[in-house]
């Protein structure tokens, strides 16, 4: 089924997802603040939308914007005014609180709203192999399901409230952060006993801890290879903050949260690592006794 789709936000993830929609035969209207990213997609067959409103007026539109501030600046009532009867899929990892505030904005504009943050890195997005965490009204989900199937290997249906998808994404990332910290602490201990970090992380990933976090990030930690980042420490700190918001909203007091907040603060302030290091660089706090 071919359709005209809008896509707003062409960072590394958004560009990969928009490319995937093009590859699956769709007409894609793209918008981004940086025109270089737009030009790359146009060269692949996309069409440029002059404004966010033009992209949002497509039959189904998607956004993959960088943070809450960017989402609030782009997905305004004015921009949605011409999208009545359409459906929007918000795929950014935003705060559940913002997702809830946006609900009435979409409703008043007559636009269906699906929250659908994703699990996966840019190459996974480009290959259409994402895990998609989707929540929204049944009618809106049905309208976008074929396109989500093109973008991901599995769509996880999480109910009718879009913000729940964002809360679940924050909870998943909270687990990833714990894994990164656990790898760092255990590598620090075994390395000081003379065990090769590469051997130790291979032991972890090939026995009890298979999966992309231990295999992929374990290798980065073993090699102390944190730049260029696949996902920056600055973004990791943002996602940890989102998890803290979810915990507060649900009345949970996580015992480990203060320690994780501390290691991110140390990495962000470190002259060698800093905010542009990969988020797995939190492993260095234990290895180097930074904190």
Regions found by a protein language model. Name each.
Residues 1-64, 86, 122, 154:
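NAD(P)+-binding Rossmann beta1-loop-alpha1 motif at the extreme N-terminus of oxidoreductases
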Residues 5, 93-173:
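Rossmann-fold dinucleotide-binding core
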Residues 17-18, 37, 102, 147, ...:
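Hydrophobic residues within alpha-helices
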Residues 28, 48, 112-114, 155, ...:
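Hydrophobic beta-strand scaffold residues
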Residues 52-111:
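Rossmann-fold NAD(P) dinucleotide-binding segment
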Residues 164-286:
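Helical "substrate-binding/catalytic lid" subdomain
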